[in-house]
Amino acid sequence: MSKAPPLRLGVNIDHIATLRNARGGRHPDPLRAAFAAIEAGADGITAHLREDRRHIRDADMQRLKAEISKPLNFEMAATDDMIRIALGVKPHAVCLVPERREELTTEGGLDVVGQQASLGPAIARFNDAGIRTSLFIAADPAQIEMAAKLKAPAIEIHTGAWCDAITDGDAAKANTEWQRIFAGAALARSAGLEVHAGHGLDYATAETISELPQIVELNIGFYMIGEALFVGLGETVRAMRAAMDRGRAKAIAA
């Protein structure tokens, strides 16, 4: 039997804030969603404070840090302003992501190789502050190796291309992307990085990727918030947790 570590579920609540902001005001409250997710079994809460504040706002991050009982993962672009805000909030972790104002969601992985001169000092500042840093990257060997060189504690593998290929019915592309993820997770772990994954995951893909023993955390948001409209957030978190547990059980039995 292999030694697969426990697998954490981070619930991204950005799109609770998207719905709130569509009408203004305070309802629905992202903090209430965080409480519900944690009660249902989430191991942490993820929120992305974008530069345009299109969903999560500064006050949301402060409230989440002050009131939730589980770790807060602060997704952010590595800008001077966001670094200053994150150091003030002092979350358990930050996940550095690429960001473009015109995108609907994070479209690709961070170019760690191309941005090493700016990312290195940012990672060092967070490490010094006791805030764990992960880098949201494609499962590309050069990016993974640079993440390790810059002393990032963790990476989050971008699973979007794999999930999109499955949704589109493109089996060949899905297999190619899966092989990249499979190899990338192994390379990252051998380089001493903690390995997370996320973007576009649903119940089926979360179960599949949970079979990779190197991965210790999945961060999932949009699919779960969509499902919650029909069955409730608590039930969605429990169903996702069950899917992950089924996948991890296969890894342990292998």
Curated annotation (Swiss-Prot):
Matching Gene3D superfamilies, A to Z?
Aldolase class I
Query: One MF term from GO for this chain?
Result: pyridoxine 5'-phosphate synthase activity
- What is one cellular component GO term in this UniProt entry? cytosol
**Annotated binding of 1-deoxy-D-xylulose 5-phosphate, by residue:** D14, H15, R50, H55, T105
Question: Where is it localised?
Answer: Cytoplasm
Output the GO biological process annotations, alphabetical, semicolon-separated: pyridoxine biosynthetic process
Report the catalytic activity: 3-amino-2-oxopropyl phosphate + 1-deoxy-D-xylulose 5-phosphate = pyridoxine 5'-phosphate + phosphate + 2 H2O + H(+)
Keyword Oxidoreductase in the entry? The reply is no
Q: Which NCBIfam families match?
A: pdxJ, PRK05265.1-2, PRK05265.1-3, PRK05265.1-5
Annotated function: Catalyzes the complicated ring closure reaction between the two acyclic compounds 1-deoxy-D-xylulose-5-phosphate (DXP) and 3-amino-2-oxopropyl phosphate (1-amino-acetone-3-phosphate or AAP) to form pyridoxine 5'-phosphate (PNP) and inorganic phosphate.
| The protein's name in its UniProt record | Pyridoxine 5'-phosphate synthase
Which species does this protein come from? Rhodopseudomonas palustris (strain ATCC BAA-98 / CGA009)
